[in-house]
Amino acid sequence: MAGARSRDPWGASGICYLFGSLLVELLFSRAVAFNLDVMGALRKEGEPGSLFGFSVALHRQLQPRPQSWLLVGAPQALALPGQQANRTGGLFACPLSLEETDCYRVDIDQGADMQKESKENQWLGVSVRSQGPGGKIVTCAHRYEARQRVDQILETRDMIGRCFVLSQDLAIRDELDGGEWKFCEGRPQGHEQFGFCQQGTAAAFSPDSHYLLFGAPGTYNWKGTARVELCAQGSADLAHLDDGPYEAGGEKEQDPRLIPVPANSYFGLLFVTNIDSSDPDQLVYKTLDPADRLPGPAGDLALNSYLGFSIDSGKGLVRAEELSFVAGAPRANHKGAVVILRKDSASRLVPEVMLSGERLTSGFGYSLAVADLNSDGWPDLIVGAPYFFERQEELGGAVYVYLNQGGHWAGISPLRLCGSPDSMFGISLAVLGDLNQDGFPDIAVGAPFDGDGKVFIYHGSSLGVVAKPSQVLEGEAVGIKSFGYSLSGSLDMDGNQYPDLLVGSLADTAVLFRARPILHVSHEVSIAPRSIDLEQPNCAGGHSVCVDLRVCFSYIAVPSSYSPTVALDYVLDADTDRRLRGQVPRVTFLSRNLEEPKHQASGTVWLKHQHDRVCGDAMFQLQENVKDKLRAIVVTLSYSLQTPRLRRQAPGQGLPPVAPILNAHQPSTQRAEIHFLKQGCGEDKICQSNLQLVRARFCTRVSDTEFQPLPMDVDGTTALFALSGQPVIGLELMVTNLPSDPAQPQADGDDAHEAQLLVMLPDSLHYSGVRALDPAEKPLCLSNENASHVECELGNPMKRGAQVTFYLILSTSGISIETTELEVELLLATISEQELHPVSARARVFIELPLSIAGMAIPQQLFFSGVVRGERAMQSERDVGSKVKYEVTVSNQGQSLRTLGSAFLNIMWPHEIANGKWLLYPMQVELEGGQGPGQKGLCSPRPNILHLDVDSRDRRRRELEPPEQQEPGERQEPSMSWWPVSSAEKKKNITLDCARGTANCVVFSCPLYSFDRAAVLHVWGRLWNSTFLEEYSAVKSLEVIVRANITVKSSIKNLMLRDASTVIPVMVYLDPMAVVAEGVPWWVILLAVLAGLLVLALLVLLLWKMGFFKRAKHPEATVPQYHAVKIPREDRQQFKEEKTGTILRNNWGSPRREGPDAHPILAADGHPELGPDGHPGPGTA
């Protein structure tokens, strides 16, 4: 088959042009004036229930006398006498008049032969078409029955259908018109053949009026067919009687396999019946399961396609100047199809192109039309699919427009026009002809169930069809429901050379809409003077400036012979753009009506005929003290056609002519600009300013005229604003108007007229006022009601080289704890020539918690000495080492923390050195303050993990003493090392800090629920003496660092703490008394002892030589009595040490025993015995 279908013919149809009710309402006021006359519509009514309007056609009779007829089919009209039926249908002809009920029934189909036929419900008038002016008419009854063997057992009734062809005067002349046409009569009957032919469901004439086209969708089991027969117009056509007929299945072959339609919708159905009849209306349909289907070849897949449901023709569809026929099959392949056919032989129509539908059950091909929409010489194809729907986009009904590509149809992506849901958009189509006289045919689309029904008018163009409807006719406007079910156009019924439109309905009513002639108006606005010089008053009296305006009109129309007198009403509106901005106009019209506003003037001009030029004058005066001297004064001319009053026509009078209308595609307005003579704008008289916002930064207000810039973030572009109760904040702004290039100052930097700075504030800031360092530079700033939008006048004009600096005072009352950023949008504005862009001033808002932390250690110096003890040997805290106490104080100078979050005081306690040995042993942690009612200051984790005994009595006593008054016993006792380390071998100092990795810390965290003033954390600990003796005995000094900080847990992201940490150092030394013993090398001591012994020996020898040891003789005396006392072993050692002169102390942590057996030796007189040095001597054994 020629013209194969493309793989994706719907590739470009995704865009659906839907014009629903809302759009119709928006456009109706404009569309009603273009160009079908709704107000003067002619209404025709038929018998109730007759379906008068089911089909319609426009017809013009030329012989024997000119007459225009509205042909209306009424397929349910009552039967005529003699037809022996109740309802047979009929064709009605309505004259062009104002009467609504003056239609008469065309006299056809008289009588009935009940032995051969039945006319009951034959639906005469189901279709009606006219050849045009002076042409024939065809109307059909597709349910007409042919009968055989009436009242016999083998009686048959075949719904073959039939058509009537009438002459132009609505009479039947059998010798020329053929009278009754029944091509299915006499053919094989039954629904598989021609028993349900239903000829005349669609009928049409070829554009050359040579052929008559019939659609018979019921043939071949509703596969359908199309038939083309010669339609003789006169004796000249008698020579071509052998031309046809042509049929899709073959006139002679009558072969259903030749029917060119795709697969059908009902393959696989089983007929189940217990009635002895072949009438398919009495069959019950059942779908067979796959297992129940009989094996064998597949059945005919083209049944029930309804080929011939719509039919038309055109020349040039496939080949230039060659006539082709188009038939619709709306149920083919469940989607519908349209087939383009050509004559192949004396009896066959051969398919050339097949176009398939897009969606299932869309009814593609239900209606169709052929028209050259783009006037390229190749007719295009319009196809209706009224059952199309799109659920997501809420579309219902579609019309596809295929633009002929030089006879090639493969790969064409049609334009899809859509209607509203359930509207049946596309059930009827009509070619209107050139409705607007632009050289391109127009079409009409019916949507009878869109509200009360609508008809959409689409204009053709060089690109095809304009997707936006130019006019929408509504059934509601004429009081008809199901309006638009049938359409007919392309004929001029009233003689004004514009085609008209006849619309039918299912409400027994038809309406004719006549097209209005279109006027093309030319207009011109003249202005004097062209420029306004404010220094040259020219009004009467010489005090003001005036401007004269003149407007002139003329028109042309199609046809050139149409030349009525028309009246145009015009309005001149000054300062239109300024008023749209809400500003006061600068002019006043002097020649205006009193009821008109001062910025408007109106008038009327009468144009007697085409090309007649008529003018009107007006004058306006410029107001005094005009500020806007740069923007031009815009004068807008608008005009409209004065509509004549409708006069009531008396019965019997002819139709009044329709009033003309202005071309809707031609603008009916014109703008003219009147400029001011510009000063300070350079030689070109174009003010090219260079306004620049060189500074926009947030500041803290120190005084009324003193501001301090806020600190900037690390990016250098965002200020940091601390929310600490300050009521206002300043925004420093500096604006300049300097040339962008000093080397070319004439390029820009001209005066900036009406220079403004527009400030848009966030909800958290509100305008409060403006300040300037120089009062002369203070701009005028005005804000709106809620102080969120500020306009500052910078000058009118802001001169070349000017610079202004000022501060906006902004209230911070709207800033809350949720506010994280302040962004103020700034935009410079001027009516001078300059492209300006908005800029933003930003500040990051943070909430600074007024918490401070400080710490101290008591004492700040610790000493170590003694002996090394293991961890298991520790029983009490006194066994560990020197005690130390830390106090960390947190102060709150602001609001309660409860409103912001949860705060924690953390202390990093260095409990180990890097190798894991104890450093500072935590004994006790207590928090004083910082708690709410009923809350305890519990810190975690718990200290004293070795559970050493706490000497609470001794602790309380020592805490009350200042550090310098502590007992010597609290100092470290030197170790009993007799191998002291020299000072030269000692290192300088070591720092033990967790932050440096030289120590390991445990973090004690204490919650601060709520406090107003201060909270104090007390931490007691002990210096682990053994670690220092083992690791740092050769170190001169050690610095132990304890760190503390405050953390806050809060959902507020912009909290910030300053001074939220502290460092508490403690110096640790080897005990200074241990340094005396251990600071001298051993060999020095040995030499000193030997030297001392030598000196002693020499001294004794010298004294002996001198007789020092010889005593004088004394008289004998009574020798006193002594008591023997046992001296403890440890005291003996002390006595020995005192004799040698070496001073030693007890080991640290080993107190001196003072028992009852350690007492001095008493002499006989009860007093202590004195030693050689004059002091009491120790007891002796």
From Swiss-Prot:
Gene3D superfamilies: Bicelle-embedded integrin alpha(iib) transmembrane segment, Integrin alpha, N-terminal, Integrin domains. Chain A, domain 2, ntegrin, alpha v. Chain A, domain 3, ntegrin, alpha v. Chain A, domain 4. This is Integrin alpha-7. FG-GAP repeats lie at residues 35-103, 110-175, 185-238, 292-349, 350-411, 412-467, 471-530. Integrin alpha-7/beta-1 is the primary laminin receptor on skeletal myoblasts and adult myofibers. During myogenic differentiation, it may induce changes in the shape and mobility of myoblasts, and facilitate their localization at laminin-rich sites of secondary fiber formation. It is involved in the maintenance of the myofibers cytoarchitecture as well as for their anchorage, viability and functional integrity. Isoform Alpha-7X2B and isoform Alpha-7X1B promote myoblast migration on laminin 1 and laminin 2/4, but isoform Alpha-7X1B is less active on laminin 1 (In vitro). It is found in: Membrane. Residues 34-1082 are extracellular. Heterodimer of an alpha and a beta subunit. The alpha subunit is composed of a heavy and a light chain linked by a disulfide bond. Alpha-7 associates with beta-1. Interacts with COMP. Interacts (via C-terminus intracellular tail region) with CIB1; the interaction is stabilized/increased in a calcium- and magnesium-dependent manner. Residues 1104-1181 are cytoplasmic. A motif (GFFKR motif) lies at residues 1107-1111. GO terms for molecular function: integrin binding; metal ion binding. GO terms for cellular component: cell surface; external side of plasma membrane; integrin complex; plasma membrane. Residues 1-33 form the signal peptide. The keyword Repeat applies. SUPFAM superfamilies: Integrin alpha N-terminal domain (SSF69318), Integrin domains (SSF69179).
